[in-house]
From Swiss-Prot:
One of its GO terms (cellular component) is plasma membrane. It is found in: Cell membrane. The keyword Lyase does not apply. It holds the Pfam family MreD. GO terms for biological process: regulation of cell shape. NCBIfam families: shape_MreD. It is a multi-pass membrane protein. Keywords: Cell membrane, Cell shape, Membrane, Transmembrane, Transmembrane helix. This is Rod shape-determining protein MreD. It comes from Bacillus subtilis (strain 168). The chain crosses the membrane at residues 4-24, 33-53, 57-77, 101-121, 143-163. Belongs to the MreD family. Involved in formation of the rod shape of the cell. May also contribute to regulation of formation of penicillin-binding proteins. The gene is mreD.
Length: 172
């Protein structure tokens, strides 16, 4: 039964990003600053840490494609970004321990890499999209702070969920 629960949970996380963006407004964030929740990226990194690389890359590819279809005009940016970062994170987890601190650190690093990757692709296509300083001050720093807080909140519930799912997958 938990096998069908994973796609449902991932769809909820996918939907939670846009709901969070629409409904949550912080008083200390100016109108110029952008808080981009990357909950899906965090959960995919948690999946690569606690289940396995194959599941994380498949879900990263599928949900990256859905992300591209819903939020961008360019197909493939998030699709390959999510899957590639899941691959890199799983290789890092083979070397490092998968305790909560290391998982949070790698997840936040993956969000950093994703933000710079997307900014790089967008700045190649649209030359006048945003300056690098504007990107760092108005988008990157608020996004990273939000995702650090989200990673701290989400790591333990998803660790328990993924560990029980991994046990059930192993038993089958």
């Amino acid at each position: 039964m938990k096998r069908f629960l994973l796609p449902f949970v991932m769809m909820l996380v996918f939907s939670a990003e846009s709901i969070f963006t629409d409904l949550v407004h912080f008083p200390f964030v100016t109108d110029d600053q952008v808080l981009a929740p990357r909950f899906l990226m965090l959960v995919l990194i948690f999946m690569s840490a606690f289940i396995n690389q194959k599941h994380a890359m498949i879900y990263g590819f599928i949900f990256g494609f859905l992300y591209d279809m819903n939020y961008t005009s360019l197909l493939g940016v998030y699709m390959f970004g999510f899957a590639g970062l899941c691959y890199l994170a799983s290789k890092a987890f083979k070397v490092l321990h998968t305790n909560a601190f290391v998982v949070i650190l790698i997840a936040v690093l993956a969000v950093c890499l994703l933000e710079f990757y997307v900014f790089g692709i967008q700045s190649l296509i649209h030359k006048d999209i945003m300056t690098f300083n504007g990107f760092v001050l108005d988008r990157f720093i608020p996004t990273i702070l939000l995702n650090i807080a989200a990673a701290l909140i989400l790591v333990l519930p998803f660790r328990l969920f993924f560990m029980s799912l991994k046990k059930e997958l192993r038993d089958e």
